[in-house]
Amino acid sequence: MDRAVIVGTFEFIGFSLCKHLLEQGCEIDGIHYNKEKEDALINEKRLAIGRNANFYEKNYSSWINSKREIIKNDVIFIDIYDLYIKNELASLREKELIEEFLIKNLDEFKDLQVKIAFLLPIQWLKDISRTHSRLEDAIDILRENNISVSCFYLPVIYGPWQPKEFSFHQALANIKRVKINEREWIHDAIFIEDLICFLSNCSDKLLGESCLLMSSVTGHWQKCADYLSLDYNNNWDSPDLAKGKVIEKAIVCSVKYSEGLEKQRSHILSIEIPDGL
């Protein structure tokens, strides 16, 4: 892959993917969601990228309302996962994204063989036909026009840059009262570096599939929670998901869960931003 567009380039997964692809020599159009308050960590992320001639940062509002350059074989990643976890889905401006970008550029996507990949929370599958029908309808239209659209449904992702909304982050940051967010999926977990390697390796051969990504380690979230001495309910049942619409793919764990968590701890300690983590 020579070039990618990452919508949500400063979100947890979007940024981790952006940094990895830049290290691979890929050219990146990094689109960052404009929010009422800019996260203090965004500047830290800019510093982590540094002066890179292959990185072009763009504001979401300006980008979605302007004439965008779409290049042959572009891969477009749209990170919705983080917005869901942080309860900031309004920042996506779904109607504009669909009408002003996805549908408006349909012919161009087809002619230029563009591939699109959505990064979504696993909870999206709980009521895929009703709650998220507008986006699902747009995806169906794109696929009907032979445009490659892949959807990756993700459990808890952990590691460096994980947002403070996650219980793992809170425990590692020594927050006294750790709260398990109702939007946190406690039935599985994947280490960020393993997810990014998977996304990077499959980006050139995206087949327009819908995939539920799962860890190769059974009870991965629970193992992490026990390592961090989190208090959680063992009796929480995994909700029914619309699995009939997706392919399940196991992500191989490259490091022991404890090593992944300690990497996250070291990263938290390396960044000192009041209220920024």
Regions found by a protein language model. Give the residues of each.
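N-terminal Rossmann/SDR dinucleotide-binding element
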Residues: M1-I70, A250
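Short acidic, S/G/P-rich loop/turn micro-motifs used as interaction or catalytic elements
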Residues: E11-I13, N34-K37, W63, D82-N87, ...
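Conserved Rossmann-fold NAD(P)-dependent oxidoreductase catalytic core, especially the SDR/UDP-sugar
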Residues: D74-L89, E94-S133
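NAD(P)-dependent short-chain dehydrogenase/reductase
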Residues: T131-I196
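Mid/C-terminal beta-alpha module of Rossmann-like enzyme folds, strongest
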Residues: F198-L277
